Amino acid sequence: MKILIIEDEPALRELIQRSLEKERYVVEVASDFYAGLDKIEMYDYDCILLDIMLPGGSGLQLLERLKELRKKENVIIISAKDSLEDKILGLELGA
């Protein structure tokens, strides 16, 4: 299973990456909006772990781009932001 982690906080990103790799998942990472955008446009993943607040743009914008590309990756939002509006929009966009 190939997983993409798009998270700007290095400690959290590395913790998730190590945990998944320990379970033998293939993991790629991106630390900002543009790096994440490049990866979702170029590659296919089984699952994307996506932060909402990213340098350069939002995770919700990346969800919109996935929808435009008609990609079917499973998306799990990981965020400290606790906005009901963001949760609803994320679900509407396929997370």
Name each model feature, range by range.
Residues M1-A95:
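N-terminal/domain-start alpha-helical segments
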